[in-house]
């Protein structure tokens, strides 16, 4: 798995929806790289014997390429289908595809949206937990990395606008890591 991120500056500049799309594409691109999912490239996925699973080619169900792949005994494999489920009503990933800021994603995902997806799909719920744990660890690490950040209590509030956090912003101003578009002061 991968957790994509957008910086506070990117979110302020682009808006949250577009920044979420770019962050998701960064994660998808990282997963594809780690799995070796690149058209025409040698797969980094290995067979049990340790040898390469073969070249990656584009295969379509019912097409001649797909049929010939089945006859190659693993020397060439069909390009996997990548799918994604987003928790909520908006597909912010597809909107960010092929934009200037988005990373190269040669296998675009077919995106499905599901309101309250974390309540209906274990994969969505798991992804939500992984994202939140990653964010919480990042906030604790940031809080411990610089004594200047202690007043904001990120290790405890994880960046949410608690009373103590808002008081610290009012007294000390936002840090370079704060999203100024939220106007918390």
Task: Identify the residue ranges that each predicted region occupies.
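RNase H-like, Mg2+-dependent phosphodiesterase core
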Residues: 1-40, 44-58, 67-185
